[in-house]
Each structure stands twice: as C-alpha cells, then as structure tokens.
C-alpha cells in the first residue's frame, strides 16, 4: 500500500521502477527486503551458512495485515522466515514503515512485542512517504505531529523494556519522527553505535556531533566564500542552527540555508534525498546565493553526479551561475565545506 516505487511518476529512467527483493543484495549491499520471494531452500541456506546481517522490511507481525500491506499472498511465509532466522541466531535489522490507520497504535505495540520475544536484532521506525502519484492505490494519510509523538512514545516504552531485559533498546525512531513531533533528538548513546544510520536513524545527531568537533579543527581560510545550502524542508531548520553556530564562532563566515519544496513528488515529501535538480534550479535561480551552492551527497545517484530526474550537477551549476559543491555525509565534511573556496568542488566524502 505504500511502496515508493508504485508512487513514482511515469517517464523516469527504468532503473527507478525496479523492485529489488534479493536476499543476497540484502547481505551484500544492505537492501531492505520483504522475504516474500524467498524459497524454503534459500531460507535454509541462509541458516546453514549463517549469512548475516539480513535487512528485512517487517511493517507488522499481524498475519492478515502483513499480507494486506505487502499486497502479496506469500507475505505469511515471510513472517515464518523471520521467526526461523531469529531462532537460528541470524542477525536481522528491520524497518517498520508506519502508516497511520494501518500499522500504528495497538498494531505497532503488537509488532514491537512480537519482535522483542523473537529477539529481533534491531528495528527502525520510519514515517510513510506519500507522493502525489497515488492513483489506484490505497488511501494513506501522512504522519502528523501527534502521530509522530505517539510512535516515539511507543518505541521508547518497548525500548526501555528491552534495555532493561536484554541490554539493547532494539527499537529506534528515524530522525524525521522527532522533527515532525517537535521533539529534541536523543543523545548519541541512545543509538547504540548507529546501527540504523542508513535508515535515517541518528543521522542528524551524528552529523551535529561531528560538525561541532570539525568546527574546532577546521582550516580557516584567509577569505571566506559566501554560500547557500540547499536541502529539504524537513532538515532545513536543523541545518540553519548548525550554520548559525558556525557563523557565531567565525564572524567573517556568511551563509544561508534554503528549504527546497518538493514540487516533483509533492510537498508531503520533505527529505533532501528525494529532491530533484529541476526543483532546486527553479527555486534557487532567482535568489541571491553567494559564491557557491552546497548540496548533500545523498541527493545524487550512488557513485554519480546525477539527480533522480537525470539533472546533472554540472547542469544545475550552469543554471545557477555558480559552482555546486557536493558535500559528504558526515559533519566533518559539512564543516570543511563551509570554509572551502568557491572554485573547489567537494568530493564524495573524506578520504
């Protein structure tokens, strides 16, 4: 009912419509899979070879609801595989995409209770992403502030129980839930080594801590180069706070953060990683931007300089009339980028 691939507009490159549910790539590349395509022979092979970790999209442990949400008659089998893997000691990282009215509230409590008893390794809770392209799909509503707060409270309730009984919280909420609920981010210790970082869990806490550490050791140039950071509406206030901190520590530094609305997928999509080059260009080209524009690495296709809409960084730079610098994913990269000269281009992260 919520698969992002099913909510894509027509006419995009074919690779974006590919639904990858291969257990081998879950192990090798960290893909989250539903296990619905897994055969009994393949499942036994995972157990025999002790292949770990496996990243699994859980969503719910209610059998009927599980089938409904995944739209697959084999979904019941995937729950059996999860139980078998847990019993065999296979490390599994899970995700629950919380859809209000479907798998939140009491259903979420049931899922967390079941995963606790299975000794599931770790599980992230993330809000459903809803684009404007949902023709023919089930009705969904976005996670609002009250729902986000309830999700956090439920996760914390079971997290405290797990911490007391087993020494791990097991359940972790994505940063986006704290932003929507208007609640402060947990401290670094909460995230237990950031096991769910790629799922947006603890990314902002890690970024802030590394950024503040980087500010203390950054190479300060003789002349500062004014900048603009382009990001999604969700992270913009957080990044503004970091930039203001940097400008307070270094009075000559000048920069701004611009929140880019997602006109391409719809304004309910507020994360930077789903912004397109055309939206950034349209919303920035008539504004004062300083000497350069900074964008986060996760806006781009892995290993390339291409946005979701096939815009290139070079094209965006030409349309904005200034260098577009790609900033790596940690806070040290961000601190370095604020002080970089206009003519340099950030690479894909620190070497």
Task: Walk through the language-model features, giving the residues of each.
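Conserved Radical SAM active-site core
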Residues: 1-119, 129-158
């Amino acid at each position: 009912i919520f698969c992002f691939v099913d909510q894509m507009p027509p006419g995009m490159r074919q690779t974006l419509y590919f639904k990858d549910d291969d257990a081998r790539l879950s192990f090798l590349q960290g893909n989250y899979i539903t296990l619905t395509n897994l055969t009994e022979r393949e499942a036994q092979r995972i157990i025999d070879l002790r292949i770990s970790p496996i990243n699994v999209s859980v969503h719910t442990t209610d059998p009927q609801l599980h089938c409904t949400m995944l739209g697959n008659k084999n979904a019941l089998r995937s729950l059996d595989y999860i139980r078998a893997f847990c019993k065999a000691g296979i490390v599994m990282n899970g995700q629950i995409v919380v859809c209000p009215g479907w798998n939140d509230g009491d259903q979420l409590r049931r899922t967390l209770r079941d995963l606790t008893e299975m000794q599931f390794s770790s599980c992230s809770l993330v809000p459903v992403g809803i684009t404007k392209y949902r023709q023919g799909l089930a009705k969904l509503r976005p996670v609002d502030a009250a729902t986000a707060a309830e999700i956090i409270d439920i996760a914390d309730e079971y997290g405290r129980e797990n911490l007391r009984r087993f020494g791990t919280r097991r359940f972790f909420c994505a940063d986006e839930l704290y932003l929507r609920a208007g609640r402060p981010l947990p401290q670094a210790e909460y995230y237990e080594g950031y096991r769910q970082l790629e799922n947006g869990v603890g990314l902002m806490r890690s970024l802030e801590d590394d950024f503040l550490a980087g500010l203390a050791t950054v190479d300060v140039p003789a002349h500062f180069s004014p900048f603009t950071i382009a990001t999604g509406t969700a992270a913009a206030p957080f990044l503004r706070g970091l930039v203001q901190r940097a400008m307070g520590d270094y009075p000559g530094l000048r920069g701004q953060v611009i929140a880019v609305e997602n006109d391409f997928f719809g304004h309910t999509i507020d994360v930077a990683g789903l912004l397109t080059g055309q939206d950034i260009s349209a919303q920035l080209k008539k504004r004062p931007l300083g000497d350069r524009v900074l964008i986060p690495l996760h806006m781009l296709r892995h290993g390339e300089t291409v946005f979701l809409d096939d815009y290139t960084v070079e094209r965006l730079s030409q349309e904005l009339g200034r260098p577009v610098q790609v900033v790596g994913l940690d806070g040290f990269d961000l601190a370095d980028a604020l002080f970089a000269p206009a003519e340099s281009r950030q690479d894909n992260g620190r070497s």
